[in-house]
Amino acid sequence: MFSLRKTKLQPVSLHQCRLSSLFRGVLIHAIEVTGTQSQASLQHGLAGKAVLSNAKYLSVLTRFRTSTRFDVWSIHRREAISSISGSILLQARDPAKLNEEIQIAVDEHRCDEAWRLFEQHMQMEGFPRKSVVNNVVVCFAESLDSNWLQKGYSLVEQAYEEGKQNLLEKEPLLYLSLALAKSGMAVPASTILRKLVETEEYPHVSAWSAVLAHMSLAGSGSYLSAELVLEIGYLFHNNRVDPRKKSNAPLLAMKPNTQVLNVALAGCLLFGTTRKAEQLLDMIPKIGVKADANLLVIMAHIYERNGRREELRKLQRHIDEACNLNESQFWQFYNCLLMCHLKFGDLESASKMVLEMLRRGKVARNSLGAAILEFDTADDGRLYTKRVSGKGSEVKEHDNPETRVVSIHSMIPYDEFSRDRKFLKLEAEAKDVLGALLAKLHVQVELITSERGVLQPTEEIYVKLAKAFLESGKMKELAKFLLKAEHEDSPVSSDNSMLINVINACISLGMLDQAHDLLDEMRMAGVRTGSSVYSSLLKAYCNTNQTREVTSLLRDAQKAGIQLDSSCYEALIQSQVIQNDTHGALNVFKEMKEAKILRGGNQKFEKLLKGCEGNAEAGLMSKLLREIREVQSLDAGVHDWNNVIHFFSKKGLMQDAEKALKRMRSLGHSPNAQTFHSMVTGYAAIGSKYTEVTELWGEMKSIAAATSSMKFDQELLDAVLYTFVRGGFFSRANEVVEMMEKKNMFVDKYKYRMLFLKYHKTAYKGKAPKVQSESQLKKREAGLVFKKWLGLS
């Protein structure tokens, strides 16, 4: 027997397509295949009660057909009935029973069956019961399968589109958002969070911090994470939410905390969106979040990347006073400070920092306290190397990183998720992801290391300082610094010192005058060197036919008591012969015989050079050659002017910023992406300056076409696009979108869709005016193109 429900019918006016799809759903999805009864038996009524029940059901449909209001049914009746052939019986599915079947499929984790039944219910009566809808969402989320996650998200999307978001509960939506984030689907994950905030179903900060943490592991996800924190943080600017009202408790539970900011900022750092990260830093005092040790170090990285040296100096006081920073965090801060000194060409401050580190290291090595410390830590060294938290807590033996990674990339059961009302497990998960992000930041520290708890410079800082001194032509200062460094550091042989390596690098790169100047500084400082460096420089002079310099170098070698090898004399003889100076060549040969110098002399430099050019290990000489060959870094003056323009733009003093930009150009400094980003965000903050941004856009394109100093990045183009959309300059907005898509940059369509609906909701609706100018026509076309790109047409 079939269980048939009485259906209340009311005569309404329906569109033909709507009506036909409705009744076809009732018929075709209410089919039961018996497989035992023939067509003949069906025609002669031998199917029994089932056929009678179906006949009764069809009689109801026949009455629909005879009604004048449902005249359209006759068009599709023949199609529906004729499609039923063979051993097929009609059955009207009971929605209540269908709900039960969906629930059973969900309980048994049969996602395909649950989805098939869900689609049947959607075509019959729309969405199932609220509990069933949420259970389907949870089932798809638990699978962590991209196909089912997409179907789950499409289900949620359809519910919001049809205004039935009341069917969706907050916890299943959060669970789905977490699953999407873990599967690398950052856009739908962030959209669900945004929808929850819009509908005032505020997610707890511990829950959405875990979603953000997984989103931040990818480039587009990290950018979206920063946008989400800015959007949610805006709700709490300047204490606008009263904590005394009980009704504000759910909203206050969503307020961004230190961990959320650390996650978003670390993601921005790893994927290079540091100007977006600086916007997050500007928000911190407005929402009253306290900085911890991790946040202080992350701030240092951001200030270094953006060239904010003064901010770094202010931060240094907090770093030095903080009592909960571990060794790694000190490395990272002073590495950032050292890098910033190099960016600004402040070689004096950088060299002073290096010498101070060496001096402290020498004291530590020679002190009795260091010896005691080394003895005490000999048995406890394993724990010392595992210090990971700010207060020096150790990682326990059972904290296996592999098990932690598994927990990060698998879903906790929904039962546990729903019971954890404070979302402590998700908070711990976000903390684990943050630890992984911070570990990647630590790997980027290359200028500083540590010995017995004392910061020490690496070879990389010597290489970078040597390059900076050479580029600025400060040979005397370079020699003075390197000699002091060798005095403070552990002694090395004169032929293997840093200064000799720099001289050899200069020779191999053809910087012979600089090499000669450094040799002179060594000689005047009383530092004795071997013959190999003189031999190398002499041969280089001979190869370039610099006779005067050869004579000068020979005189210097004699003063220093250096005996040249046979290869030098051979090079001198060959040079004289090339210049047709036979008499000079004979004199050199006689001098060589009188000195009793054997052939096959020192070939040390040639071997060293071949080793660097081949696949030898990246030693000090190789690093020097690679660093010096690289293109010169950004002019320090650009950093200075960028800071000035950023200051004025941040304060809203755009006239002063314009004057600074004009002065910057007049001094020969070419503006870069950071310069224009400060200007555009400054104009956007004060509003109604869209013409000025349009002029800047034209200048950016012309500079980018003419020079390589101007490179469009995601942050700059996103700021320009936001301003154009806000002002309704859709022709320019389409240009920016085209450029971003051509460069495969992520565009946050959701943000621009909301922005468009906020300021231009009624624009470009209905038919175009009959009378309009060409410019109006183009503006309308551009607006419609942008609207179509947003998916609003």
Swiss-Prot record:
Record's GO cellular component terms: mitochondrion
PPR repeats: 257-291, 292-322, 330-364, 458-492, 495-529, 530-564, 565-599, 601-631, 637-671, 672-707, 713-747
Subcellular location: Mitochondrion
Gene3D superfamilies (alphabetical): Tetratricopeptide repeat domain (1.25.40.10)
Main subcellular localisation: mitochondrion
Organelle transit peptide: 1-87
Keywords: Mitochondrion, Repeat, Transit peptide
Entry annotated with the keyword Cell inner membrane: no
Pfam families: PPR, PPR_2, PPR_3, TPR_At1g68980
NCBIfam families: PPR
Family membership: Belongs to the PPR family. P subfamily.
Annotated protein name in UniProt: Pentatricopeptide repeat-containing protein At1g03100, mitochondrial
Biological source species: Arabidopsis thaliana
